Amino acid sequence: MSRIDRALVSLDWEEHFENTSQRMLPHVILDHCPLLLEASVVRRGQSAFKFENMWLQAEGFVDRVQQWWIGYSFTGSPSYILAQKLKALNADLKKWNREVFSDLAFRKKNLLTKLMGLDAREESVGLSNEDQHRRIQLKGDIEHLASLEEISWRQKSRALFVKEGDNNTRFFHRLVNSRRNANLILYEDEANVRSQLVLFYQGLYEENEVWRPTMDGLDFACIEEKERLSLEKEFSKEEVFQVLKEMEGDKAPSPNGFTMAFFHKCCSIVEKDVMDFFDYFHRHSVFERSLNASFLTLIPKKCNAVNIKDFCSISLVGSVYKVLANRLRAVLDNLISESQNSFVGGRQILDSVLIANECLDSRLKSILSGVVCKLDIEKAYDHVNWEALFYLLGRMGFGSKWRGWIRVCVTSVRFSVLVNGSPEGFFGNSRGLRQGDPLSQLLFLLIMEVLSRLLKKTEECNLIRGFQVGSVNSVGVRISHMLFADDTILFVMLLEISFCP
């Protein structure tokens, strides 16, 4: 059903009224619906700490961080020490920002007022050499603050496609407002909605199935010995910090609040503690639970989302998963069948689209009957059974150390739900993978490989027969299914059923 009733606002309106919502009221007589345009202040809870990338441009910032970092003294495992140092730095940065860096907009407005005063004096009585020098300095300070403002708005806007130096603060500001309005959750009873969100995700991530089918009758590919050794080798400084450099500095921070830009700039300061953490994790397969905390960010899957199921949850996680994901991606090609092309190195998801289109074309040109069925698995990542995953890793030949790493990464997660920018709740889970985690999307490919192998086994037993691509009179290629992450397309011919002996 198309919408013909809309309320249009100007860009100036959007800048003055950031939290604007539109509601359609019931229509009684006319075909058109009355529209209610509400411009109100949204009640937001206390936001979590977020590192501001503009702080990195402050004079002497790195030296200041180094002094703080050296002064921290904690005892415990390397992961605990790293977590506590980041927490202490969090507090020092907030205090420094409040007392020294201060409010950027206020500072800029104050400088502009002084500059306007000098301009007015120049028109009336003229400026002395000292005043002219002061005006040049004021202009430089204002330009510097404008640059910091641009960095801040770019970070908030998530406009990663805009390169450094594209000085368009107004553009970034509008993007931030647009994101806030699109991701905003309006509610009548704040406490009730927050508690219901937490209860929903606690139930979603709780394993309540008492029985799951086994995979004993399916054949899986196995990794080679050299691949197993490559997965479990020690973490080098070059490997870890290359991953950090490749991660976008403006991307959303993890629950500790620090962006990748902080680690890029302060690499030499945190290097030892980060590598101690990775070395300890390599030897003992454990790390501090607080480093594995995750925010669930609710992203609307459609316009006018009103039900909680209309939102998909995306997790914001740390860089350790990126290191493991890079290693796992290197061995996936031999483990994943050709029916899956997403997230596998050397394969293109467009190939699956072309193959699916060829299957449809071949069926339309023939006189044979068939069925095309698209399966969309609801909350697929969230329903993954852990024991099935660990069993599958063993069947595919992964070593005990690697399986231990995956186990601790998957099972030690703690979640908080972000509601209008404010975290709510703190709970664990007993099933599921985190959508948005670079490692989880690869582990999910292995899970979906079970479905692919099951469909292949079904075809071998003549329970189904795929579409033949190519000439009907030639041998051609038979395609029974294509998998696109958590979406599956089946291509099945109509035939008489015969069962496996």
Where are these regions (language model features)?
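Metal-dependent phosphoesterases centered on the DNase I-like endonuclease/exonuclease/phosphatase
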Residues: 1-15, 49
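Nucleotidyl polymerases of mobile genetic elements and RNA viruses
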Residues: 3, 8-9, 27-29, 37, ...
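Short helix-loop capping/hinge motifs at secondary-structure junctions, enriched
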Residues: 14-18, 42-45
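Short Pro/Gly-enriched beta-strand edge/turn motifs at strand-loop
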Residues: 17-20, 278
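Short, P/G- and charge-enriched loop/turn segments at secondary-structure junctions
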Residues: 22-25
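Non-catalytic, usually N-terminal nucleic-acid engagement modules in DNA/RNA processing proteins
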Residues: 32
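Arg/Lys-enriched, amphipathic patches
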Residues: 35-187, 207, 212, 228-233, ...
